[in-house]
Regions:
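Ribonuclease/tRNase effector modules and their secretory precursors
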Residues: 1-108
Length: 108
């Protein structure tokens, strides 16, 4: 994991999206969503198989959501927030990043 990426998966729309170790630490931090710790595979599955909706306030952010039967506290879905970011490198080429920012449970 030299790049700091835990995994990279392709969503149903053809986007390669990654989860970094830093973002996963953020998700499972005791002040955020520590209940997500055993659900790393569900986070990946949500990005791969889930539906998504664009954030109302940030058109470069999306929420992916997918139902699971075994979630705690009557939750029905895993929600994964993903950011799309583009920049231009010094050589003029386009850099593209699509990465998980956070994840949590929700009742739909």
């Amino acid at each position: 994991m030299a790049s700091g990426k835990i995994w990279t998966v392709r969503d149903r729309y053809g986007n390669d999206i990654y989860l970094s170790a830093e973002r996963w630490r953020h998700v499972i931090d005791p002040d955020n969503h520590p209940e997500m710790m055993p659900y790393l595979d569900a986070v990946a599955a949500t990005v791969q198989q889930g539906r998504r909706r664009q954030d109302v306030y940030d058109p470069n952010s999306y929420q992916y959501y997918h139902p699971f039967l075994d979630l705690p506290d009557k939750n029905s879905h895993v929600v994964v927030c993903v950011r799309f970011r583009w920049s231009i490198a010094a050589d003029g080429s386009m850099n593209e990043e699509k990465f998980v920012t956070t994840a949590y449970f929700q009742v739909f």
